[in-house]
């Protein structure tokens, strides 16, 4: 009777259109219920029965209605699933497979089966890649996934590396060596093999891509020649090897090993500037004034060099700092080191006055055993020799930026525009509230930004610096010249690491076109998109492997009285994020560990402070001592508490 009733259909339609709806992202909890977060402002409760139809992170449309005097959201339509391709651990019961996604807020197993053609007998504990194929909001009875790739078994000590690389869909191995070109004979090369070029790297480095030579002009100025390995002599644009390098975009440096952008025969041998080996290079020569300024005699040219020494950062630093032990192999090399130190000092002084110099932060290096276990974590401070190489590389990248800008008007540029115009007022408010005069319009200029940074660098704490960081933009890769506020420079284009960065290979080809007076083509924007995306993925992979190794390393410290010095890097509503200064690990201090009475405490991300009874007890940038309360291996997270 009611089946085709138009009035009933109309009423249904009316009710549907009148039911309030919202769109948002599902946030799961460990207790079965969840929330629908709308625009980051408002959230609606999702009861456990409705949560069974969705997954944490799903973007959905939901209807709103009231139950027991509480407004709740009932997910109705899936807009964008949180999971599509993911990694997880396989469970096996009675030959039926399921997979638990490797994510801190996804605990439920998803039924799955291997795709056709995947011939692997999956066992419980195996790591695998899966693709979601069914979702309850799409009319399916439940969640379902296809297993598309076996990663490794549950007992593999190297799982942190293989799982992370699979998660981000990154290569596991160096590319195969394939046919390469002979160096282009039409590009004349100057013979610089008689000059005392040196390389300075870590002791374990095999892919040496920069060599340096300095000449004293006798009038207070110095002439610096930077010679850079020349992979584009062997890799033609558009060749199969070039396509491989373009896709990989960077050498991927992970704790314990790297996955090169180019075949190791090229990166570690044919192109590597090994001592006493004749190598083709792209070179830049520039005069550095007594005040550290770069003269306008910048010249790029192709050459051949023969490095006279493979020097090591720590040994060179020890010698320059007067620490007994290592000595330069000859007087000529000793003279080069001394002249390079002069270059470093005058350039560093110039950049302090006219640009910006990053504060020195240590690097943390994992020392690993054969099974991937962490034997120790070594803190490597940036020393004199590191600064020498850094100053020479920055100077040569400024030279490339100027030449590419003035001769072509394009290249691969690193661009950073300082404050986000939409957020600069927030920064002004924070600065003024802390006694620093600030003007939004001025802060958006390079000079104004540099002035503020110099002032903040002179402050006794990092509090203000970390507070205004949220209002700044991220560095970008661009084909058109633009300023780099972070370095305090009008333009910056890297070309000094072509073995490990595809963008530097592109700039090499453009610089060679200028040298040969040939027409050059502006790089496609797709190249910068690929570079930015790969840089993001490589950084995430490095962080993920690091988190896993930190969890392994700190596991046996949990529950002990061992104290660690830490710096507060973020304040959230739920507590503090801190970095352990002795090893670089990031840990979380939950609010209840700070003060037992929650109502007496305010953790404010807005002000970057923790207040107890109205008194500020912690600020972002503060140092404190902590102990490790717990290490959760399944989520690779470290929980700390303030030391008593």
From Swiss-Prot:
One Pfam family this sequence matches: S1
Keyword set, alphabetical order: Cytoplasm, Exonuclease, Hydrolase, Nuclease, RNA-binding
Enzyme Commission number(s) of this protein: 3.1.13.1
Subcellular location: Cytoplasm
Domain called RNB: residue spans: 189-516
Gene Ontology BP, a term: mRNA catabolic process
One cellular-component annotation, GO: cytosol
SMART domains on file: CSP (SM00357), RNB (SM00955)
Domain S1 motif: 561-643
Reactions performed catalytically: Exonucleolytic cleavage in the 3'- to 5'-direction to yield nucleoside 5'-phosphates
Top-level EC class: hydrolase
GO MF: exoribonuclease II activity; RNA binding
Function description: Involved in mRNA degradation. Hydrolyzes single-stranded polyribonucleotides processively in the 3' to 5' direction.
Similarity field: Belongs to the RNR ribonuclease family. RNase II subfamily.
Record protein name field: Exoribonuclease 2
